[in-house]
From Swiss-Prot:
Induction: Transcribed at slowly increasing levels as cells progress from lag to exponential to stationary phase. The gene is brxC. Keywords: Antiviral defense. Signal peptide: none annotated. The keyword Metal-binding does not apply. Belongs to the BrxC family. InterPro entries: Apolipoprotein_A1/A4/E (IPR050163), BREX_BrxC (IPR047679), P-loop_NTPase (IPR027417). The lineage of its organism: Bacteria, Pseudomonadati, Pseudomonadota, Gammaproteobacteria, Enterobacterales. This is Probable ATP-binding protein BrxC. Disruption phenotype: No methylation of 5'-GGTAAG-3' in chromosomal DNA, BREX no longer confers phage resistance. BREX systems (bacteriophage exclusion) provide immunity against bacteriophage. Part of a type 1 BREX system which protects against dsDNA phage. This system allows phage adsorption but prevents phage DNA replication, without degradation of the phage DNA. Methylation of bacterial DNA by PglX guides self/non-self discrimination. One of its GO terms (biological process) is defense response to virus.
């Protein structure tokens, strides 16, 4: 039995894989109905549709204006067109004849659907009178109609179905109008008589038969020939085409015929695309049909699920508009290809009973072999399973279950990547053809055969873009490739863009199996040979562990890449980046015994990567890319090489052809992409893909190099090292450890600190009191190492070489020490605490506490300089202590230099603070001791500014005499500013206060003059300290005289002031002044009196007295103004009374006119400046003659009498 004989239906029968909406002949319809497979998914969709549609059928049907739209969507090949075509057959209950037997569509579904209730719903729907119009909108539309295309197509197919003219809607409208009037048949008969042909045969050429039309129209309508001719001529102009009219015409037809009507429109989504106006037209047609026809006219459309993928170029707004249109369709069915295998099994792979038995036997004998043969590497694929049971094997043979999954991905990827035209679908219809074609190719083979994956290529070859198919055809015909090579190339093309299946060697072997018991080892060898051939011919490329089919354009790019010229330095740089940066990573080695980090100098193929200065550890890696690689291939050459100078580590990587060719390709590709960046916009996608491939190739190269490093031979300082690890970083670490332990002789001199070393350093440097330190413990903890560090620092300082912390750390980190940086810092800190060394930064001394920040900041290690500390012997310290005791008049018992210096600093700091307080007081006026204070501060600062203990004691000794003199001056300053300063301030206040202002009066008293003179003498003394005790008595003597004089002048002044105030008060009362006027006059005079009451200055008291006199004159002026106002008011009152009296007398009426009460107005005060009047009369200040005297007196008399006559009183000035 061969494969062709195992199928129930003929394998080579015609299966219409691509369904066309308008291919409805009986033969095609019968096959479609008979072979239509109702999968679980399709049954659910049918249920959903009929749940929506059935209520609109039957006598009790309900109105469904808003639910008459059905939107069927799915990807290419998901069966949308097939679904609505079968639905059209079913709803119209299409009758088909086959081999003389007639069947209706419903009868086919009785066999396919087992649910009786569901069948009853279908039966109800299909037996309701229904007109079904199925059409592909793209094939029926006229591109010139633009936005009206949707409406015109709907009208066209509707007119065509009911017998009217399809191509010319205005002709159809004429027919509709005649039909309404009952004149259509008469018109057709008249036309046949006149023209000799049937109307239906000639109407599409109505322009040529317009006269015959007019005559027939005249006869049918009984109107004149002229009127009929005009009607014909105006048909297209008077045609009222809009959506509302169309829906009304559909309603009229439904009313006349008592049917439902279904417009079933295929591929409407692609047709309207992103045309917003077409979207709105479809929406309006659907809505209006529902409302106007009362749910009897339905619109069922199909569309791509991903419309943007189908037409491209849709914006987000277009997508939103498209979604809104779909929302107007209440019933939405989304078809998928999830049941592709079920369709193919039922339509193509159903077996005969005999075949089932034979295949069952095959499974029983070779089931385990099949499972192993057809399994993929799970690390490189998603879940692609082989056969799992006998039933599955029988149902799918000669195919494997994963054929469905992979082929669907193949169709999808080829179409989306542009390798095929849009007619290639990715659902069951194209897969059905592919599976049939593949099975036919092995139809003559026995039941031990399987379908290798390349067999599917023939089914899609005709759909491919010519450039793609030509590449494969030419390669297979070039005479270099054999048949197997060509078939493998086809396989690689098919899975080129399938992401779920990596095209690795093992997976390609599985895809190439064509027999159940094929020798997989031999097949692998054959596949690998073909891959090498295809790669050499640049038909494919290897990317990581995958093999990738190359298009012509990709081959051109690949050829350009392989011809890119790259020099050795570029390759070496890339190798160094991968080996040292990506794999080994660290540039340091941490020695585990003391946690010390050692810098590594790195070399690759003889080229240094870290500059010319060598570190203590040197690692040299040699690869086959080095021209000297073959020379260093044995102990005889490698041992002496690694022993030269301070020695090094040599790592020699083994030869492995693929790795070293891959590094060339990586660098070539990088250079090619860099050189062509932005230069080839038409190849941007390909170049981007090349960049991605190269990135993946580099990742694989990293893995390969890591493996080679693990296998490499290692030599170190003249010895070949045994392999103790398989990890590259561990191999290098072991070699570094070997070098350190065999070349760092003083490494073990240092005993590592147990504990938090950073905290210990901080504690040592920031301790407040050195007495808290256990100096003995500092020495015992690491004596040899401390001695080594101290010796090296001291030796360099003796040679006048500046020593910085960075120098110390660098020296003891290198061979032969290798000491950790923190351990060396701890040793330096201990030496500083022992007083061996001090610190400075930029020529400024740095206290230990401040040094911690520099210790803790590696960037500032080169700023911290060390100095050897000088010390006095015990006798010198004792002498310095005695000197300080004499100076400070207090005991200094310290015998250690640091303690003595601390005591000196404490005393002098206190003196300095004291002097600063005295200076602040002295600066406030005429205070003694300013020079002594300033000289004392200069002296103390000169001592305190010495940062070294040794220098400070030397300074105290050299300034001993000055300090003793200052000590005596300080006693006077302390006594004055602490005890006598208040008395001195009192003296200053007296001399510069009342004594100064009243001096002229005081000088009239002899005792006061004498005391005042003595006080002023003391005030001017530079050192008045001995006379300070007399100040209080002398002040009291002057104060007593001053008080008597002040009170005498005060009494006299107050009497004068009071008299003036009282006089002004009386004048205000007489003038009946307001309170405001009284305040303005009296208040300033009263304030002057208060000032006179409290003032201790005689001139001030006399000034207040004179001020009161001036204020009295101002008061007179204000009162005079007030009197003038009073007089004006009284005169006005008198005038008013007199006018009233005269008016009464003139009118001879008896009216009593009251005289106003006139209060007496006081006299104004006239100010007369006697001296001024006399000067004006005589013209001078001096009177020399009797005549001048008489003239002056006459003038004064005239002025005074004039004032009296005016009723004023006179105040003389």
């Amino acid at each position: 039995m061969n494969i062709e004989q195992i199928f129930k239906k003929p394998l080579k029968r015609n299966i219409n894989g691509v369904v066309k909406a308008e291919q409805t002949d009986d033969a095609s319809a019968y096959i479609e109905l008979d072979e239509y497979v109702i999968t679980r998914e399709l049954e659910n969709h049918l249920r959903h549709f009929f749940e929506s549609y059935v209520p609109a059928t039957g006598p009790e049907r309900i109105r469904m204006e808003n639910k008459i739209g059905v939107w069927v969507s799915g990807f290419f090949g998901s069966g949308k067109s097939h679904f609505i075509k079968i639905l059209s057959y079913l709803l119209s209950n299409r009758k088909v004849t086959h081999n003389g037997t007639e069947r209706n569509a419903y009868s086919f579904f009785e066999e396919k659907i087992k649910d009786a209730l569901f069948l009853a719903d279908i039966n109800k729907a299909v037996h309701y009178p229904t007109e079904v119009i199925l059409f592909n909108i793209d094939s029926r539309a006229n591109v010139d109609d633009k936005e009206d295309a949707i409406l015109k197509v709907f009208l066209k197919v509707f007119n065509e179905r009911i017998g009217y003219c399809a191509d010319f809607p205005h002709i159809a409208h004429l027919e509709r109008e005649l039909d309404k009037r009952g004149q259509y048949e008469t018109f057709k008969a008249a036309f046949a008589d006149i023209n000799g042909s049937r109307w239906e045969d000639e109407r599409d050429a109505y322009y040529f038969i317009s006269d015959d039309m007019a005559q027939a129209l005249s006869q049918a309508t009984q109107q004149s020939l002229e009127a009929s001719r005009q009607w014909v001529e105006q048909l297209d102009k008077n045609f009222p085409l809009d959506i509302n009219n169309f829906c009304q015409w559909v309603k009229e037809w439904l009313d006349d015929n008592g049917k439902n009507i279904l417009f079933m429109v295929d591929e409407v989504g692609q047709f309207i695309g992103k045309n917003t106006q077409m979207m709105l037209k479809l929406q309006t047609i659907t809505e209006n049909l529902g409302v106007i026809c009362g749910g009897r006219a339905w619109v069922i459309v199909t569309s791509q699920a991903d419309i943007n993928a189908a037409i491209g170029g849709m914006s987000s707004r277009d997508g939103q508009d498209f979604s809104k249109i779909q929302g107007r369709f209440s019933t939405r069915l989304q078809l998928s290809s999830s049941n592709t295998s079920e369709v193919i099994q039922k339509r193509l792979l159903v077996k005969t009973d005999e075949a089932k038995a034979a295949l069952a036997k095959v499974w029983q004998e070779k089931g385990d072999i099949l499972r192993n043969q057809l399994a993929f590497d799970t690390t490189t694929t998603t879940a692609l399973r082989p056969f799992t049971s006998e039933e599955e094997f029988v149902d799918n043979y000669p195919f494997v279950p994963w054929h469905y999954q992979i082929l669907q991905k193949v169709f999808e990827s080829i179409r989306t990547k542009g390798a095929a035209g849009k007619q290639l679908a990715m659902g069951e219809r194209s897969q059905l053809e592919a599976f049939q074609t593949a099975a036919q190719q092995i139809s003559a083979q026995g039941l031990d055969s399987l379908v290798p994956f390349w067999r599917f290529y023939a089914a899609i070859e005709s759909f491919l873009e010519p450039a793609v198919s030509r590449t494969i055809t030419q390669a297979c015909q070039n005479g270099i490739l054999d048949e197997f090579d060509g078939n493998l190339l086809k396989t690689l093309f098919l899975i080129r863009y399938v992401e779920t299946l990596k095209s690795t060697l093992d997976n390609l072997v599985t895809l190439s199996i064509d027999r159940i018991d094929a020798d997989k080892v031999e097949l692998r060898r054959r596949v690998e040979k073909s891959l090498n051939t295809l790669e050499r011919l640049m038909l494919i490329a290897r990317v990581e562990d995958k093999y990738v089919f190359l298009t012509n354009e990709e081959k051109e790019i690949e050829n350009e890449i392989r011809n890119v010229d790259v020099d050795f330095s570029a390759i070496n740089k890339k190798l160094a980046s991968i080996i040292f940066d990506d794999i080994l990573k660290s540039r340091k080695y941490r020695y585990p015994a003391n946690k010390q980090d050692f810098d590594i100098s790195r070399f690759l193929n003889g080229h240094p990567l870290d500059g010319a200065v060598l570190n203590d550890l040197v690692v040299k890696i040699l690869t086959p890319k080095d021209p000297t690689y073959s020379f260093y291939n044995s102990d005889a050459t490698c041992r002496p090489y690694t022993s030269e100078g301070d020695g090094c580590i040599l790592i020699r990587l083994p030869e492995e052809g693929r790795t070293w060719s891959d590094i060339d390709l990586v660098v070539q590709t990088e250079k090619f992409l860099k050189d062509n960046a932005g230069q080839r916009p038409e190849q941007a996608t390909l170049l981007s893909e090349k960049a991605r491939e190269n990135s993946n190739r580099e990742k694989l190269l990293r893995v390969q190099l890591e493996s080679l490093l693990a296998e490499a031979d290692v030599w170190a300082i003249g010895e070949r090292l045994p392999k103790k690890s398989s990890t590259p970083s561990n191999i290098v670490d072991e070699a570094c450890r070997y070098v350190i332990e065999n070349t760092f002789g003083k490494l073990k001199m240092l005993r590592p600190f147990n504990g938090d070393i950073s905290r210990e350093i901080h504690a040592l440097l920031t301790v407040e009191n050195d007495t808290e330190l256990d100096l003995g413990n500092l020495e015992e903890s690491n004596p040899d190492a401390m001695r080594e560090v101290e010796t090296w620092i001291s030796m360099n300082i003796e040679y006048n070489k500046p020593v910085y912390l960075r120098d110390i750390l660098n020296h003891f980190a290198r061979r032969p020490y290798g000491w950790p940086e923190d351990e060396v810092k701890l040793l330096v800190a201990r030496l500083a605490c022992k007083g061996k060394f001090s610190f400075s930064q930029q020529n400024n001394n740095v206290e230990r506490k401040q040094a911690w920040e520099l210790f803790n900041n590696s960037r500032r290690h080169s700023e911290l300089r060390l100095h050897k500390v000088r010390r006095h012997d015990e006798a010198q310290v004792r002498k310095a202590a005695q000197t300080m005791a004499d100076i400070a008049q207090q005991p200094f018992n310290e015998r250690e230099e640091p303690a003595l210096v601390e005591h000196i600093r404490q005393v002098f700091e206190e003196w300095k603070q004291e002097l600063n307080v005295f200076r602040a007081k002295a600066e406030g006026g005429n205070n003694p001791g300013k020079n002594e204070i300033e000289s004392g501060l200069r002296l103390l600062n000169a001592i305190l500014n010495e940062k070294e203990d040794f220098a400070l004691i030397e300074k105290v000794s050299s300034l001993k005499d000055e300090l003793l003199d200052f000590s005596e001056d300080r006693e006077d300053l302390v006594d004055f500013y602490r005890k006598q300063f208040a008395t001195w301030q009192k003296l200053g206040a007296a001399l510069n206060g009342s004594f100064k202002s009243n001096r002229s009066a005081l000088e009239k008293d002899a005792a006061a003059v004498k005391a005042l003179g003595e006080l002023e003498s003391i005030w001017q003394m530079p050192e008045p300290y001995k006379h300070l005790n007399r100040i209080t008595l002398l002040i009291e003597q002057v104060q007593n005289v001053n008080h008597q004089l002040v009170e005498q002048h005060r009494q006299h002044a107050l009497e004068r002031i009071d008299a003036r105030i009282e006089e002004s008060r009386q004048r205000l009362l007489e003038a009946h002044a307001t309170s405001e006027l009284q305040n303005s006059v009296l208040l300033p005079m009263q304030k002057a009196r208060k000032r006179a009451e409290v003032s201790q200055s005689i001139p001030e008291i006399l000034a207040e007295q004179q001020e009161t006199k001036a204020l009295q004159m101002d008061a007179d002026k204000k009162i005079n103004l007030w009197i003038d106002e009073l007089r004006k008011k009284q005169e006005a009152q008198l005038r008013a009374a007199n006018e009233a009296k005269r008016a009464a007398e003139s009118e001879q009426t008896y009216v009593v006119v009251e005289k106003p009460v006139i209060q007496p107005v006081p006299k104004k005060t006239h100010l007369v400046n006697v001296a001024s009047e006399m000067r004006n009369a005589t013209g001078g200040e001096v009177l020399e003659t009797t005549e001048q005297v008489e003239k002056a007196l006459d003038t004064l008399r005239t002025t005074l009498l004039a004032a009296i006559k005016a009723g004023d009183r006179i105040r003389l000035q």
